[in-house]
């Protein structure tokens, strides 16, 4: 059977050197045509023709052990190949289908059949009803190696281990005393429940997740500017963990919370995960921006892939993954799925506000329908009468917003007002703008994608370069689309945009300056497909061009500016001239509609003129409806301008087209990549025009599906790593070929299955892990076990762990009695921030005894590249990259810093002073130092030596010694 027997042999042993992109000897073995064509030696085999070994160069070299060159084929596989060739080398069920080089694992790479990509195999627990199921798996493997587990650790050691593991703080003297005095059979389990219910549990485990999420509070790169509102994501992680949010929901919110639950502020905060990484704010030219965007997408794809799937998907940006079954197409499909994600700050939705806005919008729409029913017949009659002398092909289009600046600053359609900014002159000809004056509207009441900007202007050409008669502007991210004059090309109009992102030349041949005191009609249409078309005096202006795509201008966030491109206006190129009319349409007008609007000029009647022609009864009805509509408009504007808390989170944009880039080079786009996922884990492909919402929602649901074997495996392995010091898979973010193999594969799959069954409860999984006998073992080494398993992969003892840098700092603050346990809210900063004035920011650490700076380290401001001697020396990772598994070094500088560092000396002194204020007896003071640092009383010899040290060098010296002791630094 070719598909079951021959294809796996070719994929395993041959395709590394004989496939598309890597064809040695000009021999491609992935297709029937390739194998029949052969290479330098002629056809490799001839399909359908019964042959002999000698007639197949492929088989001759295989049987002679020349191929594969390094390791000959096993006898069994040689015989199968021989049988296949002699029978006529029939290709398979589909002769046209190539062999997928990723289908089978080989000695050099993983295939679709790699262990981590297979469905979960929930093996039955080994039969021992007296054991926690975890212990049954562990003991079965230990027994096979002739080893046994260590005895259980003493109660004091267990409580310290449990407390540091679950909340990152040492047990207090009272907690030690209560546990030691509790002789009930469930005393340990009660401590587990107490610690899991603590608000400090979320703080402890949020730190682990923030390492994976590469969370930082500055942008990185050379500017490295602060992100003052990044902290809401950190607080959300803490709350979610404390509330035991199901881990699948926890993951989905971080990928698509803002679109899954748009009215939930926590769901928006959660998307801080996607934008938690570095962000280059040095914009440069178009080429630099394009290259930078590809780097951002690589960070997104890599972070999502490693955090939730344990796969280095980002390694396939420039070529197919060298070791895992991930193609370039897979990578770019994932990149397309996340291509609507952008960095930025956004206001969080306020409870009930969205519903209030929705109700007001619905009522407004109903009122507008009634108003239109009254106005439409009269408006049509007036237009028809006025148009008798004008050769037009159709009625002019109805604008969404229309200002006639010769009469008023109030929109005749919606009542939206323009506010003068600076010395605007209102004349019978229109608004005369000079001396940096302009007009600004209130937020518009409708989200616009497609649109048309239209205006009648008189330009002062000698004073004009780069100003905008009309601009649609979104302050939240300073994006705008505008009609702009003479900025990039002298005497020419263009579609202005933020940093020229959607701006190209219209290629107009009209280079004459506008005549002074001559009215010019201008319109620019923005189409759904990204096309932008310019018009002047009702005719196409140059050529339509394809932009990078539409941006949404959201209701309540976007304004119309007249005479200015964007705010703040200082330093902007301003429009100088007179503007008579400004219109905004909620769609892209056609050529005929633009032509009609130009030809009609002033024949479009305003609302006042229409109402004057109504019968008195209709006028009264119209007035009542209009009054209600104006009240609703005011209410809507107030609601939309209500700002919630700010958070650094995903600012969604319309996804741009994604193409597979040759060697990852943004200047060499190739085949279109539709949004989708990894082929190795199942098919999911969306249309190329799918919205950002569709893309991220599908990704989040696919990724967290119980059918995805990686999601639960990766999650339970992270918890195992952090409790036991090493994962069942030793590479927590790489379950691919270069990652570790599971030490206990059956246990891993059993845990993943239980995790799913328990509805992804992390607290339930914690409890399962920390109540097993394997976790409660003593950490004492044994010679017999070390001889067989020096790395303790079989878990015959518990690993000793040194406190991580942040936990060490918190423990020192706790022992000194000044740890500030305030939970949540903006963090503290022990950095002096220096802005050089050229856009670069520096962060210099300092030490202080201010109470707000003694909070837990999870709340400490985290700048990228910020140095803090103690934390850095104790292996705190820089947040520029993810750190799924921290290193643990041992260096002389650690000892020097812990003994002589300013923080250590200050806290030792603080502890000594507090104790001396509480008791005057030297013996009691020494006892207090031991209780606060080690949670126990000193032995007789310890008390004697510590008393002598205190007498000679002061109590602070005793505090310094114990803060440097292994017993303080290590968790047994």
Predicted segments, located by residue:
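Short, solvent-exposed loop/turn and secondary-structure capping segments
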Residues: 19-22, 26-29, 70, 93-98, ...
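Primarily short, surface-exposed interaction patches in extracytoplasmic proteins
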Residues: 128-161, 165, 169-200, 215-262, ...
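Active-site histidine-acidic residue metal-binding/catalytic motifs
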Residues: 115, 221, 243, 275-405, ...
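Extracellular glycan-associated modules
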Residues: 375-645, 812
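Active-site-adjacent bridging/hinge elements
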Residues: 277-289, 309-312, 431, 495-498, ...
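Extended surface/linker regions that mediate inter-domain or inter-protein docking
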Residues: 187-328, 334-335, 339, 458-460, ...
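Solvent-exposed helix-loop boundary motif
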Residues: 1-82, 91-140, 156-161, 171-177, ...
């Amino acid at each position: 059977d070719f598909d079951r027997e021959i294809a796996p042999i070719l994929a395993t042993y041959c395709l590394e050197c004989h496939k598309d992109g890597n064809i040695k000897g000009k021999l491609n073995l992935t297709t029937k045509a390739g194998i029949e064509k052969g290479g330098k030696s002629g056809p490799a085999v001839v399909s359908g023709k019964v042959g002999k070994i000698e007639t197949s160069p492929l088989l001759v070299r295989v049987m002679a052990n020349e191929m594969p060159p390094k390791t000959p084929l096993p006898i069994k596989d040689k015989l199968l190949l021989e049988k296949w060739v002699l029978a006529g080398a029939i290709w398979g069920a589909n002769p046209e289908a190539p062999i997928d080089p990723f289908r089978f694992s080989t000695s050099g790479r993983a295939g679709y059949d790699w262990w981590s990509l297979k469905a979960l195999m929930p093996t039955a627990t080994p039969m021992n009803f007296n054991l926690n199921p975890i212990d049954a798996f562990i003991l079965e493997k230990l027994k096979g190696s002739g080893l046994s587990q260590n005895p259980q650790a003493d109660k004091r050691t267990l409580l310290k281990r449990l407390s540091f593991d679950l909340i990152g703080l040492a047990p207090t003297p009272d907690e030690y005393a209560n546990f030691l005095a509790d002789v009930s059979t469930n005393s340990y389990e009660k401590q587990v429940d107490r610690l899991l219910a603590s608000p400090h549990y979320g703080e402890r485990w949020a730190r682990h997740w923030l390492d994976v999420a590469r969370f930082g509070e500055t942008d990185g790169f050379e500017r490295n500017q602060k992100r003052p509102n990044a902290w809401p994501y950190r607080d959300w992680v803490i709350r979610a963990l404390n509330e035991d949010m199901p881990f699948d929901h926890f993951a989905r919110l971080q990928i698509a919370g803002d679109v899954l639950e748009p009215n939930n502020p926590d769901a928006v905060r959660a998307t801080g995960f996607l934008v938690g990484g570095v962000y280059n704010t040095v914009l440069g030219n178009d080429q630099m921006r394009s290259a930078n965007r590809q780097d951002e997408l690589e960070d997104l794809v890599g972070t999502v892939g490693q955090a939730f799937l344990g796969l280095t998907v980002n390694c396939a940006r420039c070529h197919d993954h060298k070791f895992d079954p991930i193609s370039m197409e897979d990578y770019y499909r994932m990149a397309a799925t996340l291509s609507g994600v952008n960095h930025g700050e956004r206001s969080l939705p306020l409870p009930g506000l969205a519903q209030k806005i929705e109700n007001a919008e619905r009522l407004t729409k109903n009122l507008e329908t009634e108003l239109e029913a009254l106005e439409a017949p009269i408006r049509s009659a007036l237009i028809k009468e006025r148009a008798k002398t004008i050769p037009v092909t159709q009625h002019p289009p109805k604008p969404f917003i229309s200002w006639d600046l010769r009469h008023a600053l109030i929109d005749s359609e919606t009542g939206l007002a323009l506010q003068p900014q600076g010395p605007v002159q209102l004349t019978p000809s229109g608004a005369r703008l000079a001396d940096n004056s302009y007009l600004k509207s209130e937020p518009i009441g409708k989200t616009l994608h497609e649109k048309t900007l239209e205006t009648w202007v008189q330009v002062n050409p000698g004073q004009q370069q780069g100003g905008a008669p009309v601009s649609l502007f979104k302050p939240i991210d300073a994006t705008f689309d505008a009609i702009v004059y003479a900025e990039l090309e002298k005497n020419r109009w263009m579609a202005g945009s933020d940093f020229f992102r959607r701006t190209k030349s219209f290629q107009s041949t009209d280079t004459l300056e506008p005549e002074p005191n001559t009215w010019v009609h201008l319109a620019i249409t923005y189409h759904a497909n990204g096309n932008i078309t310019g018009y002047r005096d009702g005719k196409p202006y140059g050529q339509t061009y394809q932009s990078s795509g539409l941006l949404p201008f959201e209701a309540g966030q976007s304004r119309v500016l007249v005479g200015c491109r964007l705010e703040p206006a200082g330093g902007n190129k301003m429009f100088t001239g007179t503007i008579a009319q400004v219109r905004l349409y909620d769609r892209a007008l056609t050529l005929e509609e633009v032509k009609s609007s130009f030809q009609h000029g002033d024949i479009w009647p305003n609302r006042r003129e229409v109402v004057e022609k109504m019968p008195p009864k209709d006028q009264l009805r119209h007035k009542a409806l209009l009054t209600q509509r104006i009240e609703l408009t005011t209410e809507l504007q107030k609601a939309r301008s209500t700002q919630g808390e700010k958070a650094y989170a995903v600012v969604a944009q319309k996804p741009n087209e994604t193409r597979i880039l040759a060697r990852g080079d943004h200047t060499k786009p190739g085949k279109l990549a539709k949004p989708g996922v990894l082929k190795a884990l199942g098919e999911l492909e969306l249309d190329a025009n799918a919205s950002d919402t569709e893309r991220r929602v599908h990704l989040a649901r696919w990724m967290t599906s119980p059918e995805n074997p990686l999601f639960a495996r990766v999650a339970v392995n992270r918890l195992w790593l952090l409790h036991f010091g090493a994962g069942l898979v030793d590479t927590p973010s790489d379950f691919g070929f270069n990652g570790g193999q599971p030490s206990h594969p059956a246990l891993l799959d059993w845990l993943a299955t239980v995790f799913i069954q328990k509805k992804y409860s992390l607290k339930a999984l914690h409890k399962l892990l920390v109540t097993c006998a394997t976790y409660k073992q003593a950490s004492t080494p044994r010679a017999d076990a070390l001889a067989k398993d020096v790395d303790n992969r079989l878990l015959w003892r518990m690993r000793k762990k040194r406190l991580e840098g942040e936990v060490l700092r918190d423990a020192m603050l706790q022992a000194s009695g000044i740890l500030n346990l305030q939970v949540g809210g903006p963090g503290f900063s022990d950095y002096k921030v220096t802005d050089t004035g050229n856009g670069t920011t520096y962060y210099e650490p300092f030490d202080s005894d201010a109470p707000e700076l003694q909070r837990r380290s999870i709340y400490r401001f985290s700048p990228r590249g910020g140095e803090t001697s103690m934390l850095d020396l104790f292996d705190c990772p820089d947040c520029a990259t993810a750190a799924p598994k921290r290193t643990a070094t041992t260096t002389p500088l650690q000892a020097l810093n812990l003994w002589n560092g300013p923080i250590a000396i200050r806290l030792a002194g603080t502890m000594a002073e507090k104790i001396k204020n509480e008791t005057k007896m030297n013996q009691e003071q020494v006892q207090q130092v031991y209780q606060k640092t080690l949670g126990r009383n000193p032995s007789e010899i310890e008390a004697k030596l510590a008393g002598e040290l205190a007498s000679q060098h002061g109590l602070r010296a005793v505090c310094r010694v114990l803060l440097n002791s292994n017993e303080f630094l290590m968790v047994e």
